[in-house]
Structure formats: structure tokens, C-alpha cells
């Protein structure tokens, strides 16, 4: 176990894709806590030398955070808050965007168009937690809608979207907050403010993960027959070509003044888990986690309680079937998780220690000892691309610092 950062400030890792492709640098932001969005820089640290470099500094009163890295290039994408924020336009779920940086040059990922007629391929609100597909060709994100938020915040439902490399998108610029973007952006999930109890309808789509390069899994909040929220696992197949991404279904890709943007034609989510009758229904929201497929794209991992109420890791075949309980721990898994690049193991926090779980047998190997002064954060446990290291956050002398251990794999 090795401490990587030492500066007297906080360091925040995203929950996946936090390493450069050469496995030498960890990227981070400098939010004072994961819940606030007041960091000014995106930075990286060399895990061998401790050298720190600034990748991007936010201009004009803006803030930045939640950075991830392209799988094969030194290309970074992160959340960017509004420049020159004022009383009418401040950072919020529906007021933020993706920005990509490569070789020191920054560009907008998503375009914004909030005036009618809305522009297909542009968003009408904020994108968040941008993650490259395994081949680096596309970027997934979660989304909130400014237009519907202005009409009624109850209509502004969290959804999942994808940025595909078929831009640029140039809105009309009829509002001073509108901007162009490099990628064609659409939603791929479908929500309703009033899901029918006991149905497959959802009012929130979130915490998505790539399944190969052409599918996304995500958590969708269903309602039980008694009206209780039950988070279930969903999957959606993505279009195969540019025409597919740009072909509208029965409702407009860009949405209307009263409806959310719609997925392209034929892009329809499918429910994979049916847990309403379990003793502890649904995927857990605590710890917050993102559903994650193995590198082979065959199994999707998620967290759910067992019959004793303990949070365990479960696997679901991407094609469907019954979920399989992988871990049988005595205590809750305490964090988000990632897969080893071989697919042979999954890393997370258990018993306040960094744990490796065999992805076939569920056997646990601990990489760290219990250390009350440096308890790992629940936010992120991330393998390096070469599989030899694993990184996390833990406090040291009052600040959240970055730590690393060898995996032995």
C-alpha cells in the first residue's frame, strides 16, 4: 500500500477509467468533497514519481470535475460547469456539459440548444460522468433536461445518453447560454414521471456501464405494486451506424417543449432483473455504484442484498436469465467496484480494506490491512489498464489522498 498524493487538499477519483493508457498516471479533480462541485482544475499524478501536472484550468468562474481517460490515447473528458455563472444560470444537474481535452486543447463534447426548434444531436441540459466506450469511439453520460426543469422540475428525470462521433453540432445560438459540440448526442433510455406500479416503466435511468462497445446497462427505478421504488437492471442495444444514430422514432430525438428527448428508432431498453418478490428487492443505492460489465461483455456485475440483508456482488448474463450471487461475505460490500482488465477479478472495499474477488469462485483476497486512520473511500476502486495496480482514495492528515497497491495479478 502506497500513498501517491500528499498536497494539503482533497483529491477525487472518478469510479472508472482514472488511469492513463500506460498505467503510469492517475487523473483526478480537486473538489473539497464528492458532493460539492467547486474544483478549478483537472490534474494527474505520476504514480511512480509523485509528479503532479495540471491538465486543465477552468476559466471565467467555472468549475470542473469527474474526469475519465480514453482507453488508448491521452484524451480526457470531464464535467464543466457554466462560465460566468449568474443568478439565472448556475451549476446544476441541468446546467453542466462534457469537455474533452487532448494535447492541451479543450473542446465541447455535447452541444446545447434550449430554444425551439430544438436541434437533433444537441442536448437541452446537463451531461454528467462521461465514460468512453472500451474502443474509445463513443462516450456515455447521464443527463438532466433544462427545458423540462423550467416547466416543472418533476418532469426533469435523470436519463442515460451517448455521444457518438458524428458531429459537429451547431445550434442556432438563440440564447446566450447555447453552444456547439463535437459529438452527436442522444438519449438511449426512456423514462416516465408516473411509472405504472409493477411494470417495466421507470422514472430514473442512471449509473450506466458499457457492455462491449454497442450496449449499455444501467439502473432503472421501477415501482412495486405498492408504489415503492425498486431499482432494477436494464440493458439497451445501440445503433450500428451513423444513420441509425440519426434516425428518429415516433417522437423527436431533440424532444419537444413538453417531452424529453427520445432515443433513436429501435433503441429500446430491456429489463434484465425482476426482484420485486425478493425479501430485499432491487439493486442497492448505498453504496452508490455503477453497473459494470466484464471486459468480455458477457456478464454485468451489480450490488444487491442477499436473503440475510447483506450487500453482495451479483452477476447477470448480458443476454438475460437469473442473477448469480458471486460473493457470500458476512458483511456489506462498502464501495463502487471495477473489473480487472483480464476479467478474472473485481476490486472493491470490504471490511474497510481493499479486496479482490475472483470473478468465478467469489473467493476474496485482501490487498490491504485494516487501518482506521486511512479507511478507503466508497467512491472508487480502480484497476490500472495493465492490471498490475489498483487505486483508491483514503484520508491522510485531514485530506483525501490517492493510494495504490499492487494486485499480484
Each model region followed by its residue ranges:
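Sequence signature of WD/YWTD-type beta-propeller architectures
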Residues: 1-409
